[in-house]
């Protein structure tokens, strides 16, 4: 079973996070940031990854530290759960429509960290949530998983729909990339290591 758990405590946040890549049990997500909980629930459903998160952060300041630290911890758990990445597809991509918006994600579990984020989020806030934190979250995930992650909103009007399309596309692309393929012997690289 490919799984991992991490506890990350800083002067700003306390995060407990666990994942299971091969289980579709119900996820429990409580970050203290309602919009992030909603997006992580969508990610869990569409990636078919069991995700449990308990986060306490300095949300009286704003949600920045909590969102970023949850992304860091999720990335570290993904890296550990994937271990040597033997027999996984490695690459994944997905287009996801959400009403008038269309999101796209392509990723490579290459061991090299990179984020391309191309999304015009015209509404700077959704409730109390600063929409610029979406990019911060994905930056933290990509750099701590050590993946190439490309996210793009091709078009759309509603900022909530755009972000939702990105999280769903990320989940679906990640599921494709982490799926074990019996045709792949060892790691999916001519280098022999990822």
From Swiss-Prot:
It is an enzyme of class 4 (lyase). InterPro entries: IGPD_sf, ImidazoleglycerolP_deHydtase, ImidazoleglycerP_deHydtase_CS, Ribosomal_Su5_D2-typ_SF. It catalyses: D-erythro-1-(imidazol-4-yl)glycerol 3-phosphate = 3-(imidazol-4-yl)-2-oxopropyl phosphate + H2O. GO terms for biological process: L-histidine biosynthetic process. GO terms for molecular function: imidazoleglycerol-phosphate dehydratase activity. Pfam families: IGPD. HAMAP family: HisB. Belongs to the imidazoleglycerol-phosphate dehydratase family. This is Imidazoleglycerol-phosphate dehydratase. It comes from Listeria innocua serovar 6a (strain ATCC BAA-680 / CLIP 11262).
């Amino acid at each position: 079973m490919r799984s991992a758990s991490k506890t990350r405590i800083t002067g700003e946040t306390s995060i407990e996070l666990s994942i299971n890549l091969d289980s579709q049990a119900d996820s429990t997500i409580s970050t203290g940031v309602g919009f992030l909980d909603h997006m992580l629930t969508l990610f869990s459903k569409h990636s078919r990854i069991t995700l449990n998160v308990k986060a306490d952060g300095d949300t009286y300041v704003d949600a920045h530290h909590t969102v970023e630290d949850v992304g860091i911890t999720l990335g570290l758990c993904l890296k550990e759960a994937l271990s040597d990445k033997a027999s996984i597809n490695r690459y994944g991509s997905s287009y996801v429509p959400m009403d008038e918006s269309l999101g796209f994600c392509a990723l490579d579990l290459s061991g090299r960290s990179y984020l391309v984020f191309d999304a015009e989020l015209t509404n700077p806030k959704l409730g109390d949530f600063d929409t610029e934190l979406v990019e911060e979250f994905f930056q933290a995930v990509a750099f701590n998983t050590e993946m190439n992650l490309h996210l793009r909103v091709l078009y759309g009007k509603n900022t909530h729909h755009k972000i939702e399309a990105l999280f769903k596309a990320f989940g679906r692309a990640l599921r494709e990339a982490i799926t074990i393929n019996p045709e792949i012997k060892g790691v999916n690289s001519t280098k022999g290591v990822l």
